[in-house]
């Protein structure tokens, strides 16, 4: 039977001051490592470091929804990853249409290694893709690894 290890990097809600905001790491037995939600600020880096999970180990991010306590750490995750692995492929980000709108706004609002963003990807100042967007729909299945599939469902909060 397939196994999966789940590490909680944050379980706090938007108003939480004592807990990092929502972020979870799924390590699947096919080698797929998936970050679900990116918390806020540098919480993923701090909590991940405590558990031996470096930010640069993420190649795939799935954002549950567009609230800042679930996705505002995205820019920091891709920035730290790009510093540690400058030649790595783009960070694959799976998100809803509404979350994509907010992700593009976040890219425009800060300059952590992103010079431009459109509905396909975010690029650095050299024109290199640093994040690639995949919009997902409710009831869609998304292949994330050799034996890892995500099943998307309508949700306004997790």
Kindly give the residue locations of the regions a language model identified.
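Binuclear metal-dependent hydrolase catalytic cores
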Residues: 1-158
